[in-house]
UniProtKB/Swiss-Prot annotation:
Purpose: Catalyzes the CoA-dependent transfer of an acetyl group to maltose and other sugars. Acetylates glucose exclusively at the C6 position and maltose at the C6 position of the non-reducing end glucosyl moiety. Is able to acetylate maltooligosaccharides.
Name of the protein described by the UniProt record: Maltose O-acetyltransferase
Annotated catalysed reactions: D-maltose + acetyl-CoA = 1-O-acetylmaltose + CoA
Keyword Transferase tagged: yes
GO cellular component, one term: protein-containing complex
Activity vs pH: Optimum pH is 7.8.
Entry EC number(s): 2.3.1.79
Top-rank taxon: Bacteria
GO molecular function: identical protein binding; maltose O-acetyltransferase activity; O-acyltransferase activity
Length: 183
């Protein structure tokens, strides 16, 4: 039988009140608090906190404030930058390629809930992974919804709400996001 953590990461219905998951969220919040209250010149400390949070050494640059659920489901490529107020709800994996930039206030969600009200009211939750390719720029206050894959060389316009997969080499914008230009 799978643990609640295994079910969560696999995108199956799970119970977020599980003791292990509650402990993991608390750990992430403590690390994020330290990160968000560190000084800009404390580069080594910030990199160590991110390594502890993500479970991998990264040269990512993330402006405080940053928020996530667990951290261990976030996988960042080389040369990653996130500006102020980035949120990543990582109940399922979030994979971001090389040379990606997130403008202020970008939110990436893997967390979702059952559509059926009986299932939703039972406390069960689920998630869907998000994958973002290489050389992607996501504009300010854009939202990437659960289950979305964004291709390489994509620009997501400010304020876009991405609800469906995005192919390579395009600019998308709007709510819901649609292709507005091919690159």
């Amino acid at each position: 039988m799978s643990t609640e953590k295994e079910k969560m990461i696999a995108g199956e219905l799970y119970r977020s009140a599980d003791e292990t998951l509650s402990r993991d969220r608390l750990r992430a919040r403590q690390l994020i608090h330290r990160y968000n209250h560190s000084l800009a010149e404390e580069h080594t400390l910030r990199q160590q906190i991110l390594a502890d949070l993500f479970g991998q050494v990264t040269e990512a640059y993330i402006e405080p404030t940053f928020r996530c659920d667990y951290g261990y489901n976030i996988f960042l490529g080389n040369n990653f930058f996130a500006n102020f107020d980035c949120v990543m709800l990582d109940v399922c994996p979030i994979r971001i390629g090389d040379n990606c930039m997130l403008a202020p206030g970008v939110h990436i969600y893997t967390a979702t809930h059952p559509i059926d009200p009986v299932a939703r009211n039972s406390g069960a939750e689920l998630g869907k992974p998000v994958t973002i390719g290489n050389n992607v720029w996501i504009g300010g206050r854009a939202v990437i919804n659960p289950g979305v894959t964004i291709g390489d060389n994509v620009v997501v316009a400010s304020g876009a709400v991405v609800t469906k997969d995005v192919p390579d080499n395009v600019v998308v914008g709007g709510n819901p996001a649609r292709i507005i230009k091919k690159l």
